[in-house]
Regions:
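Tandem CBS (Cystathionine beta-synthase) repeat/Bateman regulatory domains
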Residues: 1-142
Length: 142
């Protein structure tokens, strides 16, 4: 594999559009949303971006569900996303190189990185699975 493929912009990965929810959505509703089967998420989704006025304000992942809801035994009917999300997550753009995403995921122990435009509006999300699938295409053809 030629390491230069990691210099390609993130949009080469064809990242899926972001699943976004409002910061005041009850956790119980978000859990149902994360389980929904869609053409782009055939087994549900592991992360949802949280917005307020169309701007990214947080991310809620499966890890957040375990650490901030299940473990402390919070009432999912009375808790809203803004109380348990990861605030102001680190972001990238579709034009950033793939290697930036790998580095950010490695340093932050993330599996999902939000992609935003110049107004901080979500345009997608990149996952470790997206990167692994992209790299594997080049391994097979090598």
């Amino acid at each position: 594999m030629d390491a230069r493929i990691l210099q390609n912009p993130i949009h080469h990965l064809k990242p899926p559009e972001a699943d976004c929810v409002d910061a005041e959505l009850p956790v119980v509703d978000l859990i149902f949303k994360m389980q929904e089967i869609t053409p782009q998420h055939t087994r549900g989704t592991g992360a949802v971006l949280v917005t307020q006025d169309s701007r990214l304000v947080g991310i809620f992942t499966e890890r957040d569900l375990i650490r901030r809801i299940v473990s402390p035994n919070k009432d999912i009917n009375k808790t809203v996303i803004s109380q348990v999300m990861t605030n102001q997550p680190e972001t990238l753009t579709k034009e950033d190189p793939i290697v930036f995403a790998l580095n950010l995921m490695h340093l932050g122990h993330y599996r999902h990185v939000p992609l935003v435009d110049d107004k901080n509006s979500p345009v997608g999300v990149i996952t470790s699975k997206n990167i692994a699938q992209y790299i594997s295409q080049f391994m097979i053809t090598a």
